[in-house]
Amino acid sequence: MLLDILDMLLGTIASLLGSALLLRVYLGWLRVSRSNPVAVFCVALTDWLVMPLRRVLPLRGRLDGASLAGAFFVALLLEVLMRLLRYGANQAWFLLAPAALLVLLHWTLYLLVALVVVNVLFSLINPHAPLAPTFDLLTRPVLAPLRRLIPAVGGFDLSPLVLFVILQALLQILKQVAF
């Protein structure tokens, strides 16, 4: 039971930190202003890990390699700790890097789910909220192709629902492959 609690705590902390690092990569890719409250939150949460990595992996273009490497490092560390807790030292350690990549993909899909849900909530509850344009900007690149294919029904945009179903299907496939 104690191992299950430790497993849950490690998984939660790592997924929150890893998701914040991935969100930082995405914010940089979209060139969101560093003064944006979401960007300020991500930077405050992840600077302690990103800044030392930035010395080795400087920012080039739109891809924040230091944040991406930090997310991979967190996923790799999570895999090492989880395997040690579950199975001890008797492990196939060569599988750690592919497992960490699957964890990164898992976090990315859940991050997209969270962004879509928050964007939908903002659009329904308070579309004029200060953060609503930020979440619209974050979801627009993934929703735009679906919006071109799926017409609005009675004034309602169904593309977030379709994207949510697609993301859930991808998460189910990933669960079968990885875990």
Task: Describe these PLM feature segments.
Residues 1-179:
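Selective transmembrane helix interface/packing segments
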